[in-house]
């Protein structure tokens, strides 16, 4: 999700889950997809690809300000953990935590007999991030991905642990300057990585 921090308007850089008002251009290739979109003076390009030599999925977001004024935005990445064959069967066993040194969100399912020692992660390289491991909190009561309750809050709560409806959400606020073709490649600061 991308959100204008001044107006509260939000949209996703891909057609789902929260389609913006403008058109989307989607390109697919061997092992990757690229989504381009322009919304209210903000140009975004989301490149999703998988590593050739490991079980890692990357989402690299490039954001550019073409609005003619400075903008304060936030980018929010969201995934729902499965860690097994079917989410309804595994969700009650998934435990989330935040790794102390890196701040990455981790998830594990020790009850998965096929891979009990595997750990999934979701991370971004930006210290101003906020996180949540609680899907119910992120979506809200009777919430939906096209309009999650978290998009109405300033920050994510930081709630992680056991006995939650598990997810991983990371939100990063950032500023884009005006009239300089200024952009931000959220690749180091916001390469969402899921394994």
Range-by-range predicted roles:
Residues 1-195:
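Anionic coordination/interaction segments
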